[in-house]
C-alpha cells in the first residue's frame, strides 16, 4: 500500500480520473459534497486496522523577495542569471524572507481561509509542521496569528510548537533562494517568536539538526524525480510522527513541495497556485508506513 489522496471532498479532486484544474480560474478549495468544514471532517473515513485518514492542509508561503524578482526580470532571465545571485538592490533572496506584500497575502489567508476553517471545525490542527526556510517560518507566524487571536482556549503566552521537516523544502540546488541559512541564524531570529496575538511559536528541530545546509548544491538543480523521492521520504517522516487520533494536520511549505506531494499522493495537479494560497487533501495513510523505511 502507498499514500494516496481520497477524492470527493474538494473541487481539486472531485472523482477518480480528474485531470486537474487551474487555480486562477477555479476555486480548488471549494467543498463539493459538504456544507462546511465540520461536516466534511466527520465524513472522512474512520481509521481501520490497516489505514489511517488525515486532513492535510498544505500552505504555500507568501511572496518572497525571489518571487518578486521573478516578476521583475521574467523567468528566463531569472533562471539564467538572477537566481544564481543572492539578491539585488530591492532585497536579498538567499533563503528569502517575505516581502511586505507576501506578509499581507498570508495574513489574508489566515483571516479568510484558516480562521473560518478552524472555527467550523472547532479546533486548531492537531500538529503543525513547516519547511525550515525563512519564508515558511514567517508565513506560519503571519497566517496563524489571526487564528490564534480568536482561539480562546489558548490564552496569551501559550507556546505553539511547530515541527520542522528538513526534507520538505523547495527544489534543491543552484538557486540561492533555496539555500538554507545557518541554523543558528534562523534560531536567533525566529525561535520562541512572540506573535501579535501574544502567543509564542517554538520550532521543534530533530536532535543534531545540521548547522549548515547539507542538501543544497551550487552545481546541481534537483530533478523532478529526485524531488519526488525526497518529498515522499519527508511525508513518511511527517506521518510517522502522528498518532491515530491526530487527524487534522498543517504543513507550511512551497509550491514545488505541494506539487510533489500531490504527485506522490496520486492527486490531480493544481496549476498556477499563487503565493499565500492553501490546498487541502484527505490522505489515506498505510498503518505500516513506519515499516517502509526510507526509499
UniProtKB/Swiss-Prot annotation:
Gene Ontology MF annotations: isomerase activity; phosphatase activity
Record EC number: 5.4.-.-
Further remark: Present with 3250 molecules/cell in log phase SD medium.
Domain of life: Eukaryota
Functional note: Probable phosphomutase that may have a function related to the manipulation of phosphate groups on carbohydrates. Reduces trehalose-6-phosphate levels when overexpressed in TPS2-deleted cells. Reduces 5'-Phosphoribosyl-4-carboxamide-5-aminoimidazole (AICAR) levels, a metabolic intermediate at the crossroads between AMP and histidine biosynthesis pathways, when overexpressed in a ADE3-ADE16-ADE17 triple deletant.
Pfam families: His_Phos_1
The organism of origin for this protein: Saccharomyces cerevisiae (strain ATCC 204508 / S288c)
CC terms in the record's Gene Ontology section: cytoplasm; nucleus; peroxisome
CDD domains: HP_PGM_like
Active-site residues per Swiss-Prot or TrEMBL entry: 61, 170
Cystine bridges: none
Cellular location(s): Cytoplasm; Nucleus
SMART domains for the chain: PGAM
Site entry (Transition state stabilizer), positions: 254
UniProt name for this protein: Probable phosphoglycerate mutase PMU1
UniProtKB keywords: Cytoplasm, Isomerase, Nucleus
Family in the record: Belongs to the phosphoglycerate mutase family.
InterPro entries for this protein: His_Pase_superF_clade-1, His_PPase_superfam, PGM_Phosphatase
Amino acid at each position: 500500500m502507498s499514500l494516496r489522496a481520497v477524492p470527493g471532498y474538494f473541487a481539486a479532486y472531485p472523482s477518480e480520473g480528474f485531470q486537474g484544474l487551474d487555480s486562477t480560474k477555479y476555486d480548488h478549495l471549494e467543498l463539493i459534497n459538504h456544507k462546511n468544514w465540520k461536516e466534511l471532517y466527520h465524513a472522512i473515513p474512520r481509521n481501520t486496522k490497516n489505514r489511517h485518514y488525515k486532513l492535510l492542509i498544505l500552505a504555500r508561503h507568501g511572496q518572497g523577495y525571489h518571487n518578486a524578482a521573478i516578476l521583475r526580470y521574467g523567468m528566463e532571465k531569472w533562471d539564467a542569471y538572477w537566481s544564481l545571485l543572492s539578491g539585488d538592490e530591492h532585497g536579498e533572496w538567499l533563503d528569502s524572507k517575505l516581502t511586505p506584500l507576501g506578509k499581507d497575502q498570508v495574513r489574508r489567508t489566515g483571516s479568510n481561509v484558516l480562521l473560518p476553517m478552524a472555527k467550523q471545525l472547532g479546533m486548531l490542527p492537531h500538529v503543525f509542521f513547516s519547511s525550515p526556510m525563512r519564508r515558511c517560518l514567517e508565513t506560519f507566524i503571519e497566517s496563524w496569528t489571526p487564528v490564534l487571536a480568536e482561539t480562546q482556549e489558548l490564552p496569551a503566552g501559550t507556546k505553539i510548537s511547530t515541527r520542522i521537516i528538513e526534507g520538505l523544502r523547495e527544489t534543491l540546488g543552484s538557486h540561492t533562494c533555496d539555500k538554507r541559512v545557518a541554523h543558528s541564524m534562523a534560531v536567533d531570529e525566529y525561535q520562541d517568536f512572540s506573535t501579535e496575538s501574544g502567543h509564542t511559536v517554538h520550532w521543534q528541530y530533530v536532535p543534531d539538526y545540521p548547522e549548515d545546509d547539507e542538501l543544497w548544491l551550487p552545481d546541481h538543480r534537483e530533478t523532478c524525480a529526485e524531488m519526488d523521492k525526497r518529498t515522499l521520504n519527508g511525508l513518511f517522516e511527517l506521518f510517522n510522527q502522528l498518532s491515530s487520533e491526530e487527524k487534522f494536520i498543517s504543513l507550511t511549505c512551497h509550491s514545488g513541495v505541494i506539487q510533489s506531494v500531490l504527485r506522490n499522493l496520486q492527486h490531480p495537479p493544481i496549476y498556477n497556485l499563487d503565493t499565500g494560497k492553501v490546498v487541502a487533501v484527505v490522505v489515506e495513510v498505510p498503518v505500516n508506513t513506519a515499516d517502509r523505511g526510507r526509499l
